[in-house]
Amino acid sequence: MSHAIDELQAIIADLKTELETEPKSSVGVASNSRLARDRIDRMSAEVVDSNPYSRLMALQRMNIVKDYERIRDKAVAIVGVGGVGSVTADMLTRCGIGKLILFDYDKVELANMNRLFFTPDQAGLSKVAAAAATLSFINPDVEIETHNYNITTVENFDRFLDTISQGGRIAGQPVDLVLSCVDNFEARMAINAACNERNLNWFESGVSENAVSGHIQFIRPGDTACFACAPPLVVAENIDEKTLKREGVCAASLPTTMGITAGFLVQNALKYLLNFGEVSDYLGYNALSDFFPKMTLKPNPQCDDRNCIVRQKEFQARPKPVVIEEKAVSEEPLHATNEWGIELVAEDAPQSNPTPAETPVMGEGLRLAYEAPEKSSETSEETVTAATADETSLEDLMAQMKSM
């Protein structure tokens, strides 16, 4: 009897493994009744209904991104495929990212249905398997790799380290970016340690316990503060890990807050990967007051992570970029005591005769209402005669009147 039970358990284990490795065969995940589109070799900017990349490639035409198709050369690792991580993976897949590497060891539950990604028929599946099936159906051009294990254990941490170090689009190259979408302190510290050791840039993200605020933080080892540079509750209040994890998990969760946080995360990831716009070092969100704080956190010289100290020294040893300052050209006044440039003219200075205006060239059907009279030579002579007469003395005028 016990032998038969062991055989049945072995069969069940094999079926579970097959279910995770072949997610498309799962009921409701990506059923055969839904026909997936064919793979597309190159992104096209052609505006047709059948082109899923036309609106993305329009970013080039609008001079936002220089070469959007470079996104196919990028590999991104997402740790945590929950409320924020699943939506992040969905957005990057729709943007046409080259490769996604998903890490999570949890299963889909009905309690997750208030999120934006998973569906009730996926309950019981591992999150990475369910996500991979759905994402592959959305965009078959994206290479998706899944890892169903806890990265915080010693053995799995080494596997995680090797994956992000050699899992890039080019074999043996590191990933281009790591996105942390986990909900506990221990996992964040594991990601922080791995990225500090391998000198990889990464984004940390999170949503508050009351579900009305969130944040993202861009961490560049040595340049900005790592997650261990400002240790939170564990060091400050000596709280054990179980208590911290219970407090850190969102007791409440809103799909709106998670969607906004995921949107901030992907938006800044795209800006970093495609080199456009300004990447925020820290961006927060408070839903109650619609407040979006931004700041930059400098690394702690006494950080407990020794690799962080090494990266800080390496960053300080780098040559600083030379900033060429343009010298301001001082405009000296025309006159030292006359800043308005007013010029004085003597009363006996010769007056320049104004040049008569030229008759403008009129279009067909147009004529001038009147023409200015031209000064003739006769008019000038009369003027001279009148001026001469005006110079006659009073006695001469009296004599002329008496003789009349």
Curated annotation (Swiss-Prot):
Bias kind Low complexity: ranges: 382-391
Binding site for Zn(2+): C226, C229, C303, C308
Signal peptide region: none
Annotated stretches, region: Disordered: 372-393
Residues reported in the UniProt entry to bind ATP: G83, D104, K127, N150, N184
One Pfam short name: ThiF
Keywords, ordered alphabetically: ATP-binding, Metal-binding, Nucleotide-binding, Ubl conjugation pathway, Zinc
Membrane-traversing stretches: none
UniProt-recorded Gene Ontology molecular function terms: ATP binding; metal ion binding; UFM1 activating enzyme activity
Gene Ontology CC entries for this record: cytosol
Domain of life: Eukaryota
InterPro entries: D-isomer_DH_CS1, ThiF/MoeB/HesA, ThiF_NAD_FAD-bd, Ubiquitin-activating_enz
GO biological process terms, semicolon-separated: neuromuscular process; protein ufmylation
Residues annotated as catalytic: C250 (glycyl thioester intermediate)
Function description: E1-like enzyme which activates UFM1.
PANTHER family: UBIQUITIN-ACTIVATING ENZYME E1 (PTHR10953), UBIQUITIN-LIKE MODIFIER-ACTIVATING ENZYME 5 (PTHR10953:SF9)
Family of this protein: Belongs to the ubiquitin-activating E1 family. UBA5 subfamily.
Name of the protein in question: Ubiquitin-like modifier-activating enzyme 5
Organism: Drosophila sechellia (Fruit fly)
Organism phylogeny: Eukaryota, Metazoa, Ecdysozoa, Arthropoda, Hexapoda
